[in-house]
Amino acid sequence: MVDSKKRPGKDLDRIDRNILNELQKDGRISNVELSKRVGLSPTPCLERVRRLERQGFIQGYTALLNPHYLDASLLVFVEITLNRGAPDVFEQFNAAVQKLEEIQECHLVSGDFDYLLKTRVPDMSAYRKLLGETLLRLPGVNDTRTYVVMEEVKQSNRLVIKTR
């Protein structure tokens, strides 16, 4: 995790920011096309991309898959409240949830509950099984609340990167 006090992004120049914006739009863009879009020749552009990778600004490249084609069309968010009386309950929960492939995201949050999970499953029957056989049995789980998504209005992984 990056120390937020250091704010490494403040040292990026306009070209670095443009490179990151273009790669967010299309991670498969060729270096030649990327260099044209950001106003560099190919070699310095590739050197900048490699530097951004080394420095951790670019963590990897991935394909965006259509969940409806892959038997994962039901999107569910789950609030988890832990039994805070148990020792090391947060660490145990964190370790256990890391092993669950069905959980796409797990966030420790402030508020009336402890964690917000995002999961995708084929249907409600599969979710009921996941909840009853897995989530409720995770270390320290005291309570859950389920929110089934009826419609995905907006979905994006893009970060806002100001080009100044």
UniProtKB/Swiss-Prot annotation:
<dbReference type="Pfam" id="PF13412">
    <property type="entry name" value="HTH_24"/>
</dbReference>
<comment type="subunit">
    <text>Homodimer.</text>
</comment>
<protein>
    <recommendedName>
        <fullName>Leucine-responsive regulatory protein</fullName>
    </recommendedName>
</protein>
<dbReference type="InterPro" id="IPR019885">
    <property type="entry name" value="Tscrpt_reg_HTH_AsnC-type_CS"/>
</dbReference>
<dbReference type="GO" id="GO:0005829">
    <property type="term" value="C:cytosol"/>
</dbReference>
<dbReference type="InterPro" id="IPR011008">
    <property type="entry name" value="Dimeric_a/b-barrel"/>
</dbReference>
<dbReference type="InterPro" id="IPR000485">
    <property type="entry name" value="AsnC-type_HTH_dom"/>
</dbReference>
<dbReference type="GO" id="GO:0043201">
    <property type="term" value="P:response to L-leucine"/>
</dbReference>
<keyword id="KW-0805">Transcription regulation</keyword>
<keyword id="KW-0804">Transcription</keyword>
<dbReference type="Pfam" id="PF01037">
    <property type="entry name" value="AsnC_trans_reg"/>
</dbReference>
<keyword id="KW-0238">DNA-binding</keyword>
<dbReference type="InterPro" id="IPR019888">
    <property type="entry name" value="Tscrpt_reg_AsnC-like"/>
</dbReference>
<dbReference type="InterPro" id="IPR036390">
    <property type="entry name" value="WH_DNA-bd_sf"/>
</dbReference>
<dbReference type="GO" id="GO:0006524">
    <property type="term" value="P:alanine catabolic process"/>
</dbReference>
<dbReference type="GO" id="GO:0006355">
    <property type="term" value="P:regulation of DNA-templated transcription"/>
</dbReference>
<dbReference type="InterPro" id="IPR036388">
    <property type="entry name" value="WH-like_DNA-bd_sf"/>
</dbReference>
<feature type="DNA-binding region" description="H-T-H motif">
    <location>
        <begin position="31"/>
        <end position="50"/>
    </location>
</feature>
<keyword id="KW-0010">Activator</keyword>
<comment type="function">
    <text>Mediates a global response to leucine. Exogenous leucine affects the expression of a number of different operons; lrp mediates this effect for at least some of these operons. For example it is regulator of the branched-chain amino acid transport genes.</text>
</comment>
<feature type="domain" description="HTH asnC-type">
    <location>
        <begin position="12"/>
        <end position="73"/>
    </location>
</feature>
<dbReference type="InterPro" id="IPR019887">
    <property type="entry name" value="Tscrpt_reg_AsnC/Lrp_C"/>
</dbReference>
<dbReference type="InterPro" id="IPR011991">
    <property type="entry name" value="ArsR-like_HTH"/>
</dbReference>
<dbReference type="GO" id="GO:0043565">
    <property type="term" value="F:sequence-specific DNA binding"/>
</dbReference>
